[in-house]
Amino acid sequence: MVKNTNLINISTYKNDVIYFEKEMHEILNNFAKYFKINKQIILDVSIVSSYTSRKLNFEYRQKDKTTDILSFGYDDFDLYDKMPFLNLGELVICNNKIKKQAIIFNHSIKREFLYLFTHGLVHLYGYDHQSEKEKKEMDFIVDSIFNPLKITRND
């Protein structure tokens, strides 16, 4: 596996947005190891406002509400088989929704953000949770990638 060459491009809608870049890279490395990806991974992450999240959720999913994370994958994995890198796509994370959910679920913001980041990565790789069977499989994969970081509710 190509270590520490994975690239995460992060854009934020304001300067004081909190994100956890070191841990995001650790999770991306765990993701590559789990799926046996032996090339550089490129990922775009946009941290957005509630307004932008709601607007994108309506435009792309016809759901008129703010959501915690949206994933827009580059699904042409056949193309990336021929490339020296894998461009996974873009995760759009709603900063305010993460903060609210952290309170609701009694998690730290760090844990909520990074768990949803991991969840989004797995979506980008083609997994979904439309059925109970899919949900169990996806939860298992997310936990396998996330849990080695040992991030607790209080971190």
From Swiss-Prot:
Any GO BP: rRNA processing
Cofactor note: Binds 1 zinc ion.
Principal EC category: hydrolase
Organism: Mycoplasmopsis synoviae (strain 53)
Superkingdom of source: Bacteria
Family (UniProt): Belongs to the endoribonuclease YbeY family.
UniProt key word Lipid biosynthesis: no
Chief location bin: cytoplasm
Function: Single strand-specific metallo-endoribonuclease involved in late-stage 70S ribosome quality control and in maturation of the 3' terminus of the 16S rRNA.
Protein name: Endoribonuclease YbeY
Record InterPro entries: MetalPrtase_cat_dom_sf_prd, YbeY
Keyword Hydrolase on entry: yes
UniProt-listed Pfam families: YbeY
Binding-site list for Zn(2+): H119, H123, H129
Keywords: Cytoplasm, Endonuclease, Hydrolase, Metal-binding, Nuclease, Ribosome biogenesis, rRNA processing, Zinc
EC number: 3.1.-.-
Location within or outside the cell: Cytoplasm
